[in-house]
Curated annotation (Swiss-Prot):
Biological function: Associates with the EF-Tu.GDP complex and induces the exchange of GDP to GTP. It remains bound to the aminoacyl-tRNA.EF-Tu.GTP complex up to the GTP hydrolysis stage on the ribosome.
PROSITE patterns in alphabetical order: EF_TS_1, EF_TS_2
Compartments where found: Plastid, Chloroplast
Family classification: Belongs to the EF-Ts family.
Gene name of the record: tsf
InterPro entries named among the record's database cross-references: EF-Ts_dimer_sf (IPR036402), Transl_elong_EFTs/EF1B (IPR001816), Transl_elong_EFTs/EF1B_dimer (IPR014039), Transl_elong_Ts_CS (IPR018101), UBA-like_sf (IPR009060)
CDD domains given in the database record: UBA_EF-Ts (cd14275)
Keywords for this protein: Chloroplast, Elongation factor, Plastid, Protein biosynthesis
Keyword Protein biosynthesis recorded: yes
Coarse class of the protein's main subcellular location: plastid
UniProt-recorded name of the protein: Elongation factor Ts, chloroplastic
Organism field: Porphyra purpurea
Amino acid sequence: MTLQISAQNVKALRDKTGAGMMDCKKALEASNGNEEKALDSLRQKGLASANKKSGRTAIEGLLESYIHTGGRIGVLVEVNCETDFVARRPEFQKLAKDIAMQIAACPNVEYVSMMHISDETISLEKRIEAGRDDIKDKPAEMIEKIVEGRIKKRLKELSLLDQMFIRNQDITIEDLINQNIALLGENIKIRRFVRFILGGGEENTKANFADEVADILNKK
């Protein structure tokens, strides 16, 4: 039986760490309500204190580029921080490089986060899913539930922050950024990115392209 975590306990942990409410709730559930263990878990994930910095203005940073081996795919990404001092830190520069290589390995990613996806795009995706042959003859209520699940999965595929980090499949890109916020002590944001494909043709001719990029990452 799952332990019920009270809102007061979640708020108390949030006040101590600055982590998000859902992150605090999940940490408390995973630790069976033990606040000390939950706090350690948040610190290990780099989530403690990250949210306290997330509202601060990030206007410095750098533009990072990555050209994949063979020159078939290129990426340009803007990663922002608060000061030029942090922008020059090797840890920040490594983060920007990792993000650029992540984008190269994720052909479906089109947005920084799900919040950037327009209502028009979401509506279009819903219409496409609702009209698929495998569900169009099902009851309306069932179609709605199936479409909702598929849309949630589709939006995650489009969002960079929701991708699993190719160097460490246990964390997302959002987790990676939060870890670096905790490490460097400044707000960090991905502002924008663009992905170029040579000739504008197929994104990838190899099924294991993500693995190919991951191998390069792991050698660095």
